[in-house]
Each structure stands twice: as structure tokens, then as C-alpha cells.
Amino acid sequence: GFFECINDQEAAFMLFDRCRVWLEERGMESMEGPVNFGERNEWWGLLVDGFKPPVFQMPYTHKYYVPFFENYGFRDYFKQYIYRTRLVEESLSKVVVWKSERLLKNEDYRIISYREMTPRQAKDSFLTIYNKAWNLNVHGVGGMDKEQVEVLFKTLKPVLDPDLLYFAYYKGEPIGFFIMIPELNYIVKHVNGKISGLGILKFLYYRHIKRGRVALGLIFGVASEFQGRGVEAAMIYAFCKNIIQDKKTYDWLDMS
């Protein structure tokens, strides 16, 4: 679960000890954390570098937590990174452009945005790709069913921007997606946790009028048999061209 503690190693070790005993009593032989109860793409891990205002779904923990975990004996299991790039032509990787152009010379491949799709097409394509793209044996990652996809898109609806969702197809079959949203912490911090009355008005104002300048890469997937061919590059390039050439709202892209 999550971890909160004052700046006192003894207090931290008391919490760790209690967790360890609880797990041992239930037959567990290892302990990991801090983790969110759910998929590992949301609020997992301990922040060890880059103590700046966090982006949506990124954990924020105090710097003094790091030695608590290390001194108790925790070691890295896997590392997660957040990257930021400026959305200008100069920042576009030549490799991304080359891969995209090479792939799209084959007319069997097609990249389209959410604007060109119906919600039903997007949901069905997402479900197909997700369950082909992710290694279901990877720790913390599971498959999705139709009901979960419906819930996901219903949750995204208030913040969905059609310019931030891209899908790849091969001979009409869905093979990849790149799902982004506006960086939500920019909006949420003005609402102060109160999504009602004035809070709703503030949410709508900062979502649609005084909009943020950062797009957040939420989830990326390419069907396993099409990985390594440049499909991901083609989706990234399509998004960047759309934003840069049409001078859309966003100046930055954050990805994890």
C-alpha cells in the first residue's frame, strides 16, 4: 500500500516491521512497495529523483523516504521514468520521422486520430490491441475485458481530447494505440478536491478555457507481432505533426 511517515527512521522501521509481520503471518516470503492497489501504471513506486510538482498518476513522496527504504533493506525491483519533450519540430527525433515514413510507404498501414472514429470503434480497437500488446505474464499487468474498457472510456470522457488519441491499423485490423490526456494535476490543483458546485465550474474553466500546456502519455500499446516495425514512431509522428503544424494548445509531452 501507500507509505506516509514523519522524518524519523525509527518510526518508519516500526511501520515496515508491522507490515512484514502481517505478511509473514499470511505465508508471504517477500515484501514490496510502496504500491497502489491496482495496475502498476498508476501511483506505483518511490520517487527518488525529480522532486518537482508531479504529473497525473505519478506518486509524490518525500526525499527523506529514500534512505528509510534503503536502510531497511529494500532494493530496486524495477525502475520507472517520466520523460518530457518540447513539442517543436526541432525536438522531433530524426529516427522517429524516418521510421514513420518508412512504415507508411506500405499503404496497408494507417494511423488515425480519435476525431476520425466513432466511440465504439475506439473502444473495440483499444480492447483488441491492449490484450495483444501487453505481456500478461509481466508483474502488475493483466488483461482487460469489455466492461473494464467501458469504465475506462467513461472515466476519460470529461478530459478526453480527440487530438490526443491515435490508433494504428494494418489491413483494417487494429494493431496499436497511443492514448494521451491533458495533464490533469494542472486542473485538479485549482479544484482542491471538490468536484461539485464551484469546483465543477473551476474544472470546466481550466479544462476548456485556460487550458494547460502539457499533454500526458497515459498508455501506449502495439500488438506483439507488430512491435519493432515503427508503428509506435508513426503514431508519435502523427500526433506531433498535428499539434505542431496546426499550433494546437500543447507545448510539452510527458511520457512514462
Regions found by a protein language model. Give the residues of each.
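Conserved beta-hairpin
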Residues: D17, V21, E25, E70-Y72, ...
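Acyltransferase donor/substrate-recognition loop-hinge adjacent to the catalytic core
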Residues: P59-G140
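Acyl-donor binding region in acyl/amide transferases
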Residues: G1-G73, V191-S256
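Short loop segments at secondary-structure junctions
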Residues: R86-E90, K171-G172, E225
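Short catalytic/ligand-binding loop motif for oxyanion handling, primarily in non-cytosolic enzymes
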Residues: E39-W43, Y77, S91-S93, G176, ...
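A conserved beta-strand-loop-helix scaffold within acyl/acetyltransferase catalytic domains
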Residues: E4-C5, I112-V222
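Sequence-level motif detector for i,i+2 pairs with an aromatic at +2
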Residues: F78, N106-Y109, I175, G212, ...
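Short beta-strand segments
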Residues: E32, R84, F167-Y169, I179, ...
